Amino acid sequence: MDGMIAMLPAPLQQLSSHIDFQGQKVAERTYQVILTLAGIIGFFVGYSTQQLSYAMYTVMGAAVFTALIILPPWPFLFRKNPIVWQTPIEEQEASSSSDNEKKDKKKETKKTK
């Protein structure tokens, strides 16, 4: 993804391209609803006019409309719930705590035997 962003012009590289997990859920649901409705509407348009091309144009137009709504990471739709990451622990603390955990596990297994 970073390689694709690097190919963009400089002003576009400044835009954020990430959405949060809740935003992904909203985007997926919006995509499903719009395209399902477009399929139903396209079917009736094609049936009433007896033109398959009208049905296809209806669905393709809805697909373009959906892409315009879903693809940009709109901050008011898809980035409302940012992910809060835990701060990384230092290596010494991590290794000493994992050593202590291993010792505790060994003690527990000896006690149970």
Curated annotation (Swiss-Prot):
One example of a Gene Ontology biological process annotation: protein targeting to ER
Keywords: Endoplasmic reticulum, Membrane, Transmembrane, Transmembrane helix
Residue ranges annotated as Lumenal topological domain: 54-57
Cited InterPro entries: Spc1/SPCS1
Topological category with respect to the lipid bilayer: Multi-pass membrane protein
Transmembrane intervals: 33-53, 58-78
Residues covered by region (Disordered): 89-113
Cellular component, GO, one term: signal peptidase complex
Subcellular location: Endoplasmic reticulum membrane
Topology Cytoplasmic: residue spans: 1-32, 79-113
Family the UniProt entry places it in: Belongs to the SPCS1 family.
Function: Component of the signal peptidase complex (SPC) which catalyzes the cleavage of N-terminal signal sequences from nascent proteins as they are translocated into the lumen of the endoplasmic reticulum. Dispensable for SPC enzymatic activity.
Subunit structure: Component of the signal peptidase complex (SPC) composed of a catalytic subunit sec-11 and three accessory subunits spcs-1, spcs-2 and spcs-3. The complex induces a local thinning of the ER membrane which is used to measure the length of the signal peptide (SP) h-region of protein substrates. This ensures the selectivity of the complex towards h-regions shorter than 18-20 amino acids.
Protein name from the UniProt record: Signal peptidase complex subunit 1
The encoding gene: spcs-1
